[in-house]
Amino acid sequence: MNLARSGDAPQPRRWWSPWRIVGLVCVGLFLAGIGRFYDHRTGFTSLISIGDKLGDGKVPALKAVPHYVYEDSYGYDGAYYVQIALDPLLTGSELQTSVDNLPYRAKRILLSWTAWLLGGGQPFWIVH
């Protein structure tokens, strides 16, 4: 004989558990923090740290794409790796003059190839 009472039915789970709310707040804060770096003209390219002292030392494909440039700075490694990502086969002769210590940096090609693949080989999408 089944004497189950109506109050014994399983209760539906609440969507607003405290841990879920904390997780959603953390995701929201992370996205808001990353969103500060977005510019409608240059996208997220400020995260690459390309300096103006590179000047004419950029590969032509990078010069053709709008990107954020830090003034009075050489930039950081991202400035070189984005140029390698624009030509991951390293066939362009301009890479020799535009990338500092190319043999050393070419050994770390995974991120450059990943950017090239995700960008579909299109310079705008590779840089952004």
Positions of PLM-derived features:
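Start-transfer (signal-anchor) and selected internal transmembrane alpha helices
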Residues: 1-61
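A near-ubiquitous, low-amplitude feature marking generic local secondary-structure context
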Residues: 30, 64-68, 97
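Generic anion/oxyanion-binding catalytic loop in active/binding sites
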Residues: 36, 70, 103
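Aromatic- and Gly/Pro-rich amphipathic surface segment
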Residues: 52-72, 76, 80
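Short hydrophobic/aromatic helix or loop-helix immediately within or flanking a transmembrane segment
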Residues: 75-93, 97-122
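Short, intrinsically disordered, charge-balanced linker/junction segments flanking boundaries
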Residues: 122-128
